[in-house]
Each structure stands twice: as structure tokens, then as C-alpha cells.
């Protein structure tokens, strides 16, 4: 009875709905400002959905097609940048970032610079991950291939990490099998159940986070939340490779664990995997605590930090398999343009998508619209919605878009100066047409442009 009452109370609060459609706020970023590219190949993700199998998992190559994922990644990068080749796409990515963030004209990548790839391994374990949603080995490898083979970053200068979790075996072997010098950073020393490096016969390239002070906050007194890995502080660039995933769901007996603390886990919250003291920030994002409507969000400070989010050259959402909660099995998305079957669960229809942008605010804005659209008219046999979006879901995006005039009234500061707009926030016109202001008016639109590519 207590659990039912708690779920009922939580559901009353899960009343999020997009407001003020096609009314962008903030300043769009990117070569093509505010552009978000969404690429889908339904044949890339083909897992059977057999949750009870111990030998058939979504992350296996027989279920997730590496060649198709690579093609999706290439199409995403080229459409995002307007380039005709992957090499040209990366040249434009680095040149744009170095001009915008470092004031360097016509400056591309130099081979002494480290590129960190920030991933979401919230459900990772040293011995394996079962079928909980984590960053996929296939998308991670596709990104590493792009960096090494097309951006010409030496493998030894690529650092893949989630400093709050341990790296699961399939991810290590997938990357090291092709790029032996790629480094990984995790939350602890290597564990004996983790695979040794096939090229070195030991744990070469698997490092624990070396915590150093690197982040400041515009409100509240935090201690360990100021600490980030030395390895990431030393990096020149960051790729924010997050998941398209909600964070809270009250009807979760099947999956176990608590209901969650906030609405979504995309590129904004992905930075929680970079700081030691994430528990210190939980109250600020928990809508049952300090995360009230239009409250201060530490996500803004993490996104603006010169040692963290301000290093970002590319934002991407792995949406091959999406989740409804921080601890979640893959979820079918039944509504357009995905049109997955939801019953029986054991079927091969999945979101099977990648989304990317130069503008993290724009990307998460699109992500929220996608998640919300999939929550509509989507009920299980108990008449529970299969996915819910918790209240205040887009508040942090409004704060990021206008930190100099934030709805919370917070004075966001970095290095003693007001934090400028971190991107543009907007909701699409409707779930049916999915049009943003730059789609409707390419010449005068000031918000997001969404490009959908079906492969």
C-alpha cells in the first residue's frame, strides 16, 4: 500500500508538458546555428528483447550492427557540419570550436591535444551489465573510429570515461581490440573481473580517476562536487556522448532500485559522471527537494566550466536503445516517427537512432520533445504509462539558455564574469509535425533546426 501511495503521489507530480512552443530563448550555437541532426536506421538495433536470456544481450554485435552504426555516425557528422567527407566534418568541428572558445582563427586539431569522450555508464558493473541501458560499445567504437581515423587524433590521445562508474568488459574489449592505446578512466583501480588488455596482457590504459579541484559553482557550498579527474582537466577537448534517457519512473518493480531524482539524463546531467561529489548535487536537481520550479541548477555551472563543459566540441545522444529511468531496460518507442511495437516486449523494434549538435541546449531540448512525445498514449497492461517525464524537466535548459537573466534569479558566474548563453532552448510545434523555428523560417528563425534522416 505504501508503494502504491508513493507511486500515486509521484504520478500527480509527473505533470510535465512542453510550454510556449516555437518560442526560442538563448543564443544558438554551431556552424549552422541551432542545428540538431537525428539519424535513424531501424536495422542498426535488432535485439530480440528477451530479458530472461543470459546469452543474448542488446550490446552484442549480433544484435547491434557496427557497420550500420558507423554509417549513422558518418551521416550525422556530415549533415551537422555541411561537409561532404568525415575528414572535412572534423576539420570544421575543431576549427569552429577553436575560433569560438579559444579565439584561434583557422586552427584545427594538433596531435599533442587530448580528446576526452564522456559517456554514461550509470548501470555499469565490472563483471558485465546484463540488459540495463548504458552507452553502447558500438556507438563508442564508432566515435573512437571517427576521432582516430578521420579527425586524425592519435589513439593515445583519446580518453573514454565515466569517472563515477566502472568500465564494463564488453566496452573495454571492443575498443582495445582495435585501438590498443585508447585510455579509459573509471572510478576505481582495475578489478580482477575486468578483462586484461589484449595487447599488453595487463591493465595498461585503464586508470582510476585522479581527483583534483576543477569546477566552481554559482550557488551553494559544495566540497567534493568541485573535484574532477586530473585526466579530464588536462584534456583540450570534450565529446559529450550521452544517452537519450529519462531519469525517473515510479512503477519500477520490474527493474528494481529507487524511482529516480530528476526528469531526464542527457548531455546536461552527463557531466555528473565527471565529478566526485555527485551526491552533494542531488538535492538541487531532485524535485522533491531543492529542485523546485525555476531553481538554481548546478548543471549550468558544469556546462560552463572551462575545465569541463566549455571544452565540448560535439554533443551526441546514443538513442539505439533508450530508457525510462536511471536503472532501466531498453524501451520501445511506439509513436511517430519511430513506430515501435510495444507488445510483446520481446520484439526487435527499437529507437535505433543517433542525435547530435554543436549546441547542447538545443540537443537536450529536442531530446525532451522526443521523450515526451513517446510518453503519450503509451500504456501497459496495468494502464500505467510506460514512460513519464517528471516535473520541471526543462528548467535547467532555460537556465542554460539565459544564465545572464536566469528564471531562477541566480547570477551564474565563471572566472568572475557573468556566464553567457550556452545555447538556444525551444520546443517543437507539435509531436505530429516536429518543426522548430528555423525549420519554419530558415531565414529569420532564431531557434532550433531539426533535420531527420531515415536510413
Predicted regions and their residues:
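Extended, low-polarity segments enriched in aliphatic/aromatic residues
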Residues: 5-111, 122-130, 134-455
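N-terminal export leaders
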Residues: 1-3
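Short glycine-rich phosphate-binding loop at a beta-alpha junction
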Residues: 114-118
Amino acid at each position: 500500500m505504501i508503494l502504491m501511495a508513493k507511486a500515486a503521489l509521484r504520478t500527480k507530480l509527473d505533470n510535465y508538458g512542453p510550454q510556449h512552443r516555437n518560442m526560442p530563448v538563448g543564443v544558438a550555437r554551431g556552424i549552422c546555428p541551432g542545428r540538431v541532426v537525428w539519424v535513424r536506421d531501424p536495422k542498426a538495433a535488432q535485439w530480440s528483447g528477451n530479458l530472461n536470456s543470459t546469452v543474448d544481450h542488446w550490446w552484442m554485435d549480433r544484435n547491434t550492427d557496427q557497420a550500420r552504426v558507423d554509417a549513422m555516425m558518418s551521416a550525422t557528422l556530415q549533415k551537422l557540419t555541411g561537409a561532404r567527407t568525415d575528414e572535412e566534418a572534423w576539420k570544421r568541428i575543431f576549427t569552429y570550436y577553436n575560433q569560438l572558445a579559444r579565439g584561434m582563427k583557422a586552427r584545427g586539431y594538433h596531435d599533442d591535444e587530448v580528446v576526452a569522450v564522456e559517456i554514461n555508464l550509470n548501470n555499469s558493473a565490472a563483471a558485465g551489465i546484463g540488459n540495463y541501458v548504458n552507452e553502447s560499445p558500438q556507438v563508442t567504437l564508432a566515435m573512437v573510429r571517427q576521432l582516430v581515423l578521420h579527425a586524425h587524433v592519435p589513439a593515445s590521445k583519446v580518453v573514454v570515461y565515466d569517472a563515477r562508474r566502472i568500465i564494463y568488459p564488453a566496452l573495454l574489449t571492443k575498443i582495445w581490440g582495435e585501438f590498443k592505446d585508447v585510455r579509459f578512466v573509471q572510478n576505481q583501480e582495475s578489478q580482477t573481473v575486468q578483462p586484461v588488455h589484449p595487447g599488453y596482457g595487463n591493465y595498461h590504459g585503464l586508470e582510476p580517476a585522479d581527483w583534483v579541484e576543477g569546477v566552481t559553482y554559482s550557488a551553494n557550498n559544495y566540497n567534493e562536487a568541485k573535484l574532477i579527474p586530473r585526466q579530464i582537466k588536462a584534456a583540450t577537448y570534450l565529446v559529450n556522448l550521452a544517452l537519450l534517457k529519462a531519469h525517473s519512473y515510479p512503477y519500477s518493480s520490474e527493474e528494481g532500485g529507487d524511482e529516480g531524482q530528476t526528469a531526464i539524463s542527457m548531455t546536461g546531467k552527463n557531466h555528473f559522471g565527471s565529478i566526485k561529489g555527485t551526491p552533494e548535487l542531488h538535492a538541487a536537481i531532485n524535485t522533491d527537494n531543492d529542485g523546485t520550479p525555476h531553481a538554481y541548477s548546478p548543471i549550468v555551472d558544469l556546462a560552463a566550466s572551462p575545465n569541463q563543459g566549455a571544452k565540448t566540441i560535439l554533443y551526441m545522444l546514443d538513442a539505439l536503445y533508450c530508457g525510462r529511468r536511471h536503472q532501466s531496460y531498453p524501451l520501445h518507442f511506439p509513436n511517430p516517427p519511430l513506430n515501435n511495437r510495444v507488445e510483446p516486449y520481446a520484439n526487435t523494434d527499437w529507437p535505433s537512432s543517433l542525435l547530435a549538435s554543436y549546441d547542447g541546449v538545443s540537443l537536450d531540448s529536442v531530446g525532451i520533445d522526443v521523450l515526451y512525445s513517446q510518453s503519450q498514449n503509451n500504456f501497459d497492461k496495468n494502464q500505467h504509462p510506460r514512460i513519464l517525464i517528471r516535473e520541471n524537466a526543462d528548467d535547467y535548459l532555460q537556465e542554460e539558455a539565459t544564465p545572464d537573466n536566469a528564471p531562477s534569479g541566480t547570477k551564474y558566474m565563471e572566472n568572475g564574469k557573468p556566464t553567457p548563453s550556452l545555447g538556444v532552448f525551444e520546443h517543437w510545434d507539435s509531436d505530429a509535425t516536429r518543426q522548430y523555428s528555423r525549420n519554419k523560417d530558415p531565414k529569420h528563425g532564431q531557434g532550433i533546426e531539426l533535420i531527420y534522416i531515415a536510413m
